[in-house]
Regions:
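Membrane-proximal intracellular helices of multi-pass ion channels
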Residues: 1-446
Length: 446
């Protein structure tokens, strides 16, 4: 075997680079968070707590075992914010940005890895798209910070500048981390701003902007408001996203928040409709919501955002393809269709695989935590959905969990961020299927 063939055999695939890249950043972040400099008390953070926080930040989840605002120092918060930004953009995108800034030429292998990392349809134009992502991200985060600056500076003085920057990045990256907690008010999220339209609207817009995907924004910027010119995927994402905001908001409005004034009730319903799809902020007391509303939120958490975005979950396109395939079956059509375009059968198979994997992870993780911690299954399923969907919403039990249960949530967050199919492709990338096919036989379904 020649030296070239040996090198090619042991070369990492793009999917392997992605999962190892995330793991490396998480480990480095955990080590930094263990430093006494990272905490307000100047103490060393246990490794499992630092690992949990770093995983939650890189996987843009928002679940925490220590209150971010009161436990971590400004240095620790800066480490968390850096991890959120890297996780939101993607490890490969951040690495590529440094290569672009240094003037280095991006190889074809690196372009292919970048394509897989941001779910781009082709390798061509990937460098231009990466520049667009970087410029767009920092511009939108800057606008979000400036919008929230007057409110936070009014409430926190000069520290409000850091507050505005932190929450803008956290919202755009769909992370859900907040630094509003104090020793007397732990884990508040945005409950103190439930009636503040500036915070509500700004955070919601940042979440939606980060969650619809960079490719969708590229399509919008290129074709402006000419919806008919958009790619089929962009149309599906926009329609599905709008549907998943409006319908749950109407449900929440009529089922919960009776005690709020009309304006605040509308804001609360909209916010709780937007945030479960991987953002993790909340403006109301979640355990006080009805069981039906919490069930709807679990569904939204599992669905998540859109491909190539800062969000996690099984993705809006997965849901849309499965529903379109069901509609095609009822209408006795050969394939799912969107906007006069046919969906390839491989996409339907991939969507079904993703759904199966997410449901298995969600249910398996929730059952394990419920059995180990002796807690109600419904609460544990909520935390599991929040972890695997990289959301960050909690009913308050995550900080109380023992280490084995925390390790389960860490695994769910990691798998939810890198994606189950990425792990499968990374494991089988060097294997090839044979040409032989087994005999076919019918099986009864339903």
């Amino acid at each position: 075997m020649s030296e070239e063939m040996v090198c090619r055999k042991h070369r990492l695939s793009s999917f392997q680079i992605i999962i190892l890249g995330f793991a490396g950043v998480i480990l480095l972040g955990a080590l930094l968070l263990m430093l006494p400099l990272s905490t307000t008390a100047g103490c060393v953070t246990p490794f499992h707590e630092a690992l949990f926080t770093a995983t939650s930040a890189v996987c843009v989840t928002g679940l925490v075992v220590q209150d971010t605002g009161s436990y971590w120092s400004v240095f620790g918060q800066a480490v968390i914010l850096t991890l959120i930004q890297i996780g939101g953009l993607g490890v490969v995108t951040v690495a590529a940005s440094f290569a672009l800034l240094s003037g280095r030429r991006i190889s074809l292998m690196q372009r292919s890895t970048m394509q897989d990392a941001i779910s781009a349809p082709k390798v061509g134009g990937i460098v231009r798209l990466t520049r667009f992502i970087l410029r767009g991200t920092f511009l939108i985060e800057l606008i979000g910070a400036l919008a929230m600056l007057p409110v936070f500076c009014r409430d926190y003085g000069w520290h409000g500048i850091w507050m505005a920057v932190f929450h803008s990045v956290s919202a755009f990256c769909n992370a859900g981390f907040d630094i509003l907690g104090t020793n007397n008010n732990l884990y508040p999220s945005l409950t103190g701003y439930v009636q503040n339209p500036v915070i509500n609207i700004t955070v919601m817009l940042l979440i939606i902007t980060g969650g619809i995907g960079f490719l969708t924004w590229d399509d919008i910027c290129e074709n402006k408001l000419h919806f008919h010119r958009y790619r089929m995927q962009s149309k599906v994402i926009l329609v599905t996203t709008l549907t998943l905001i409006v319908l749950p908001a109407l449900f929440f409005f009529f089922v919960d928040f009776d005690a709020l004034p009309l304006g605040a009730r509308v804001q609360a319903a909209l916010f709780q409709s937007v945030t479960p799809r991987t953002a993790g902020f909340n403006t109301v007391n979640l355990p006080a919501m009805s069981g039906a509303s919490l069930g709807v939120m679990i569904l939204l958490m599992l669905i998540g955002g859109s491909p190539g975005s800062t969000a996690g979950g099984m993705k809006t396109t997965t849901l849309a393809v499965l529903l379109a395939n069901a509609a095609a079956t009822f209408r006795q059509r050969d394939s799912a269709q969107f906007f006069g375009r046919r969906v390839d059968h491989s996409a339907v198979k991939t969507a079904a695989t993703i759904l199966t994997m997410y449901l298995a992870l969600f249910f398996g993780g929730g059952v394990f935590i419920s059995v180990y911690e002796d807690l109600p299954l419904s609460s544990c399923l909520y935390e599991a959905a929040s972890a695997v969907g990289t959301v960050g919403l909690t009913l308050g039990i995550t900080p109380q969990l023992h280490i084995p249960s925390q390790m389960v949530l860490i695994a769910l967050m990691y798998l939810g961020r890198v994606g189950g199919l990425t792990l499968i492709y990374a494991a089988v990338s060097s294997k090839k299927n044979g040409n032989a096919k087994l005999p076919q036989e019918r099986i009864t379904i339903g």
